[in-house]
Swiss-Prot record:
Upper classification of the organism: Bacteria, Pseudomonadati, Campylobacterota, Epsilonproteobacteria, Campylobacterales
Source species, domain of life: Bacteria
CDD domains associated with the record: pyrophosphatase (cd00412)
PANTHER family linked: INORGANIC PYROPHOSPHATASE
Record carries keyword Cell membrane: no
Protein name: Inorganic pyrophosphatase
Length: 172
């Protein structure tokens, strides 16, 4: 896979997310930026699993030196390496041992799964879903030496767009 050829899409309603880790996985995969191969990074040290499909937006550069992270919230796992068009609904603001590490929040766009059309912002999600996401990121590194996470709060689509636009500028 040539990541440089994957377009960012139309902000905020048709963002192309590259999935690295399927919903429900306890294995952390990363796509090797040079070869495009899906590499096993590690098995989660904690007895937990990813609460959403986890990936990134190609051709962006977040403050942590990686492409900007994104969670695609839906009810089914998406294969690692797949690209899914999605719509931004918010962002989870957090920090880890490497610095700020925000996670954009998105849902599949209407063509992919129209069941999410009524989700306009993260506050439209069930509180239980938000609690699971927050709990996951508060605890997923707890058993890993020299790693830590500080989860702050969820913010709206406007904050997500600002983070994405900054990451696009950082990449150029």
């Amino acid at each position: 896979m040539n990541l440089s050829k994957i377009k960012i899409g139309d902000i905020p309603n048709k963002i192309n997310a590259v999935i690295e880790i399927p919903y429900g996985s306890n294995i952390k995969y990363e796509i090797d930026k040079d070869s495009g191969a899906i590499m096993v990074d590690r098995v989660m040290a904690s007895a937990i699993f990813y609460p959403a499909n986890y990936g990134f937006i190609a051709n962006t550069l977040a403050d942590d030196g990686d492409p900007v992270d994104i969670l695609v919230l839906n009810e089914y796992p998406i294969q690692a390496g797949a690209v899914i068009p999605c719509r931004l609904i918010g962002v989870l603001i957090m920090e880890d041992e490497s610095g700020m590490d925000e996670k954009l929040l998105a849902v599949p766009n209407s063509k992919i799964d129209a069941r999410y059309d009524n989700i306009k912002t993260y506050t439209d999600l069930p509180q239980a879903t938000l609690n699971k996401i927050k709990n996951f990121f508060e605890t997923y590194k707890i058993l890993e030496p020299n790693k830590w996470v500080k989860v702050q709060d969820f913010k709206d689509e406007k904050a997500a767009i600002e983070i994405l636009e900054k990451a696009i500028k950082n990449y150029k």
